[in-house]
């Protein structure tokens, strides 16, 4: 609980969201290479909103939608949006089980750091992770790939022609 810097910005975090980590900044760096002014970004499993908000702060003129199943995580993301973004920046957060409640809209970029730990491996994680991070932000089901398959399978309906999907993946996936 408290504040965690990510991409140079101070994000509020608590027990309802995964604490942003430096490794995830690589995802933001790669996404920035793909973005153009005016592009739209969809952040699946947004958590604290750190990925989406960092992209919107670093690439002016883009708009973004962050999606998460957890209402409590979305409250954290919204708090970060109000703290970091100008009111003029087009950014919304939606509660949805992945694409279920997402309106039909096209995005230039779908980005995600989904849960990717195999269920059986969670108990082997370091105590500061397994005991203090939300399990729903960690558990990628039996093989750790559940969310990748779901997002990749459905995202094509939401991508603009020539759009991109970028994921953070585990070191062993």
Question: Where in the sequence are the language-model features?
Answer:
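Conserved SAM-binding loop
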Residues: 43, 66, 140, 166-167
């Amino acid at each position: 609980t408290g504040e965690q810097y990510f991409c140079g910005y101070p994000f509020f975090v608590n027990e309802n969201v995964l604490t942003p980590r430096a490794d995830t900044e690589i995802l933001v760096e790669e996404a920035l290479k793909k973005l153009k002014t005016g592009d739209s970004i969809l952040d699946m499993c947004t958590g604290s909103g750190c990925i989406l908000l960092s992209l919107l702060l670093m690439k002016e003129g883009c708009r973004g939608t962050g999606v998460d199943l957890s209402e409590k995580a979305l409250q954290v993301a919204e708090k970060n949006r109000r703290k970091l973004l100008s009111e003029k920046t087009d950014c919304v957060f939606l509660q949805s089980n992945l694409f279920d409640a997402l309106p039909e809209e096209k995005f230039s970029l779908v980005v995600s750091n989904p849960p990717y730990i195999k269920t059986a491996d969670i108990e082997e994680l370091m105590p500061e992770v397994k005991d203090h991070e939300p399990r729903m932000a960690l558990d990628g089901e039996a093989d750790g790939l559940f969310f990748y398959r779901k997002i990749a399978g459905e995202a094509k309906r939401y991508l603009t022609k020539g759009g991109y999907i970028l994921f953070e993946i585990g070191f062993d996936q």
